[in-house]
Amino acid sequence: ITHATPASFIAHVPHRKAEEEIATYFLKTEIDFFLGGGKKFFDQREDDDRNLYQELKEKGYQVSDYFKMDFDDIVVNKNKNFAYFTANESPLPKSQGRDYLPYASRVATSFLKKRGQEKGFFLMIEGSQIDWGGHANESEYIISEMLDFDKAIGEVIDFAKRDGETLVVV
């Protein structure tokens, strides 16, 4: 969640590798829902002794992570902002068992629709490991990530069809 693409929507830092600094921006915003890797930049910090994971809870977020509970078992409270950490650092590739992206997309659209009935919402979903597979020149990695991302986008398109007022940009 602290990588360049998702972080660019909330954080403004001079370097993409400033992930501990990026993590602090999650406490400076009222982001409704976020899910992704990078837990260590919240609760195992090297630059200071802050526990941003705990600070999110104190700010009223419903916070959990893969160590405590599978994402499939989470009951999301629409009355609280939501944070779930899928990995301590970067999430596993799809080929190594990561299987939550389509389900998380469905949960996020439902949650955000309930939260933003009047004003609407913006949701950014990244298939970042497609790029990583490309850099590694690993075709199977790329294909498995693209298929997983396609399923996630399918969930969003299904939501948009039901909703009738949603624009999907891929």
What are these regions (language model features)?
Residues 83, 119-125, 166-168:
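Generic beta-sheet signal
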Residues 105, 109, 133, 160:
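Functionally constrained cores in energy, signaling, and assembly domains
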Residues 115-118, 162-164:
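Glycine-rich phosphate-binding loop signature in dinucleotide/nucleotide-binding domains
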Residues 147-170:
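Metal-dependent active-site segment of extracytoplasmic phospho-/sulfohydrolases and closely related
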Residues 1-115, 128:
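His/Asp/Glu-rich, glycine-adjacent segments
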Residues 4-9, 89-93, 116-120, 124-155:
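Active-site His/acidic residue clusters
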